[in-house]
Each structure stands twice: as C-alpha cells, then as structure tokens.
A protein has these predicted regions:
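Peptidoglycan cell-wall recognition and remodeling modules
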Residues: 15-109
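Membrane-proximal envelope biogenesis segments
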Residues: 1-19
C-alpha cells in the first residue's frame, strides 16, 4: 500500500475545447439530430429518459429553459415545437459544447 501512495503512477489531463464561436453549420445539426433520433422531434428513448430530436433529459431541458426560455420550463421536450427544440439545443451547445451528446456530438465542431 505504501508503495502505491509513494509512486501513484501516470495521470490523465482532460482538456476541454471551446465550441466553435461561429457555431455548427446546418448540416452538422442535421447529422446530430439524425444520430440522436433519426431526426424525429417526438422521439423518446427506450427508457423514457431522453426525449425529442436532441434527446434531452427533462432535467437538462428545464435547466436550459430556466436560463433562457421560461415558457418552456415543464414542457416535455418530445412535445415541444421543432423550432423550440432547435433553440434549446443551440443554447445547450453554447453553454457546454458538443460533450452534452457523448456519442453523436462528434458531428458538431
């Protein structure tokens, strides 16, 4: 045990990258939507935890809505208008980058 404490081994540094200030292009958003939900704005994951075209959790949706679009707090992401889902995804991207979509975020800059 003492040997491990005295010699902890290599460490990993994770570096976050800033989102592209110009933002993703339309075709990149389309690729993300297709990857997340085949572009279906009413999509619901098999567990029911992720909803809408961008597969928002209700908690993340309400957090972003509370910051920018109070009228959308409490709205089911899968029932929200497409333009509202698009705005919410763009707002989330500006705050957190593509990492909010762990698999499909690879389509965004």
């Amino acid at each position: 045990r003492q040997a491990v404490l005295d010699n902890p081994g290599p460490t990993t540094t994770i570096v976050a990258t800033e989102p592209d200030p110009k933002g993703p292009k339309k075709y990149q958003w389309e690729a993300l939507k297709y990857c997340e939900s085949t572009g279906n704005y009413q999509a619901v994951s098999p567990t029911g935890n992720y909803r809408g075209a961008y597969q928002f959790s209700v908690e993340t949706w309400n957090w972003i809505a509370g910051l920018y679009y109070e009228n959308l707090v409490g709205v089911d992401p899968a029932a929200a208008r497409p333009q509202d889902q698009d705005r919410m995804a763009e707002s989330l991207y500006l705050l957190r980058g593509r990492g909010q979509w762990p698999v499909c975020g690879r389509y965004l800059p």
